[in-house]
């Protein structure tokens, strides 16, 4: 029991010593952390002071430094005159500081000159940055994707519906043709070797011709409804009559195949009902055509 108690006492002493050492280490760490925080705060203050000094230098401190030198100039003779009695010693003492004070003026003037010389150096990078920013702003709108998205449709953005190909072709037809001249001028103005100039020009002309032909063909397929209504008021009647005739034929085939009792009339009476819309006058069909438009069904 005595040995165990002695061992326990030794362990407890060691633990106490370790705890004391840990406390000392913790105090040292706290002191170090406090020192580090103080150093960081001092660095922040120095950064703020340097920024303020730079602002003062760029703002206009030379106007304040030069008057200080002019104010300090008359202080020397006043102090010299009030210092000692009138005599040759006083004159000599007054003459010596006057010579000493004279070189101070050009030094301060030189300081003012340095500050004045620093101003354009600090202002030049800002002007250069503004010029570069303006240059980037002028370069960005030349992107062909932005022009396509902005000029492809005047009223709506480029939205692809179910008929994607028709939508894209319609947007291509709506594009202005004036941009082609600028693009041709840009491609012609680019520097190319002599052997490839003729080939590139021929390819460009062929592509332009095919594009113009394709565009004219598509525009002829997609007519302007308002213009055609003014020139030919009844231009939509034959297409509508054909569509109606086709629908009536389909209805007739279905009725004959199914044999349903929907049409109680005899077979002799059916063609009468079918022939009436085909032989009807265009005036009777015009009010019914107003609700349906072929252009809206094909072109988005």
From Swiss-Prot:
Residues making up the signal peptide according to the UniProt record: none
Subcellular location: Nucleus
Basic residues compositional bias, start-end: 246-256
One Pfam family matching this protein: FAM212
Tissue note: Enriched in the nervous system.
Keyword match Nucleus: yes
Protein name listed in UniProt: PAK4-inhibitor INKA2
Species of the source: Mus musculus (Mouse)
Biological classification of the source: Eukaryota, Metazoa, Chordata, Craniata, Vertebrata
């Amino acid at each position: 029991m005595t040995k165990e108690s002695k061992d326990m006492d030794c362990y407890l002493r060691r633990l106490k010593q370790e705890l004391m050492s840990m406390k000392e280490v913790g105090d040292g760490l706290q002191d170090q952390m406090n020192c580090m925080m103080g150093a960081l705060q001092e660095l922040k203050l120095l950064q703020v002071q340097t920024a303020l000094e730079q602002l003062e230098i760029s703002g206009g401190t030379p106007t304040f430094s030069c008057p200080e030198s002019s104010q300090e100039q008359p202080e020397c003779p006043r102090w010299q005159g009030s210092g000692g009695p009138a005599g040759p010693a006083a004159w000599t003492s007054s003459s010596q500081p006057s010579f000493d004070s004279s070189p101070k003026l050009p030094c301060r003037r030189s300081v003012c000159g340095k500050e004045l010389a620093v101003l354009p150096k600090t202002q030049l990078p800002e002007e250069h940055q503004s010029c570069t920013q303006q240059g980037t702003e002028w370069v960005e709108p030349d992107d062909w994707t932005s022009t396509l998205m902005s000029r492809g449709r005047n009223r709506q953005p480029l939205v692809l519906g179910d008929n994607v190909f028709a939508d894209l072709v319609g947007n291509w037809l709506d594009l202005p043709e004036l941009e082609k001249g600028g693009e041709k001028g840009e491609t012609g103005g680019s520097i190319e070797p002599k052997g490839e100039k003729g080939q590139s020009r021929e390819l460009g002309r062929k592509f332009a011709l095919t594009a113009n032909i394709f565009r004219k063909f598509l525009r002829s397929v997609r007519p302007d409804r308002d213009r055609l209504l003014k020139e030919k008021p009844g231009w939509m009647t034959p297409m509508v009559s054909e569509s109606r005739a086709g629908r009536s034929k389909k209805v007739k085939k279905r009725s004959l195949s199914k044999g349903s009792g929907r049409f109680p009339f005899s077979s002799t009476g059916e063609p009468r009902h079918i022939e009436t819309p085909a032989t009807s006058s265009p005036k009777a069909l015009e009010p019914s055509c107003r609700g349906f438009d072929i252009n809206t069904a094909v072109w988005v």
